[in-house]
Design a protein with these regions (language model features):
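Core catalytic lobe of class I
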Residues: 1-197, 236
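S-adenosyl-L-methionine
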Residues: 200-236
Length: 236
């Protein structure tokens, strides 16, 4: 079961049909809410420069959404370096603070009244990570590869080293690589066997010293692959 303060973040892009944006996520958002998941936040993934091409009169696409659900909130980790760390740059020339005020008009401890700027801050609601470019490895491919930096950013913000993170759409194994990089424990699912192979091979190519085995039998991936080929040859 998920921890009480577990956070669910889901990336979805735009779809156009008959010259309109299709809000295909509406039914799913309603279903999540009916299951007790709050529509906690809605972020934008800034993918960098717009994609080249003819977009039928629209601006070139350069973003996607990230929907954030939870049952209870958790403060994100401060992972973004502050440009003016250690400086009192939030003070005006005449000495008053530019820190955010509360509803009562007072500047309190949460906004660090009278303190220098911290080393790090919480991430913005716009996630600025360049889209993936190029190949993902030798003799492997996937039609929708995400940059490792995207799940890495989320994992650093909403989990701690040693935490278990769940990826229900394993794809090319991007979240698995991000978990390995950030010292999290990934649990991923992928329904397409061919993409499961891609994810495993991609992980092996990035981490050749880490053994990959089938839990049920202890076989290595190479042994399982060879067994499949033997079965396929026997069926022909």
């Amino acid at each position: 079961p998920m921890a009480g303060d577990g956070q669910v973040l889901v990336n979805l892009g735009l779809i156009h049909r008959d010259n309109e944006v299709i809000p295909y996520w509406d039914g799913w958002l309603a279903w999540m809410r009916s299951q007790g998941w709050r529509r906690f936040a809605w972020y934008v993934w800034d993918q960098g420069p717009g994609m080249p091409g003819d977009w039928q009169g629209r601006f070139a696409p350069s973003f996607e959404f990230v929907f954030h659900f939870n049952r209870e909130s958790r403060k994100p980790n401060k992972i973004v370096p502050c440009k003016h760390a250690g400086q009192e740059s939030h003070r005006r020339a005449y000495g008053s603070s530019t820190a955010m005020r509360g509803k009562d008009g007072e500047v309190g401890g949460w906004t660090h009244k009278g303190q220098p700027t911290q080393d790090t801050r919480i991430p913005d609601s716009v996630i600025r990570v360049m889209r993936h470019k190029g190949k993902i490895g030798r003799d492997i491919d996937h039609p929708a590869v995400f940059p490792v930096a995207l799940p890495e950013h989320i994992l650093l913000a909403y989990s701690d080293p040693g935490d278990i993170v769940f990826e229900p759409f394993g794809g090319s194994g991007t979240t698995i690589l991000a978990a390995q990089k950030t010292n999290r424990v990934a649990r991923a699912i992928e329904l397409a066997p061919s993409y499961t192979d891609v994810a495993v091979k991609r992980f092996q190519q990035n981490h050749p010293d880490i053994p990959v085995t089938l839990l049920a039998t202890g076989q290595t991936f190479a042994e399982v692959e060879a067994e499949r080929l033997e079965t396929a040859d026997a069926d022909e």
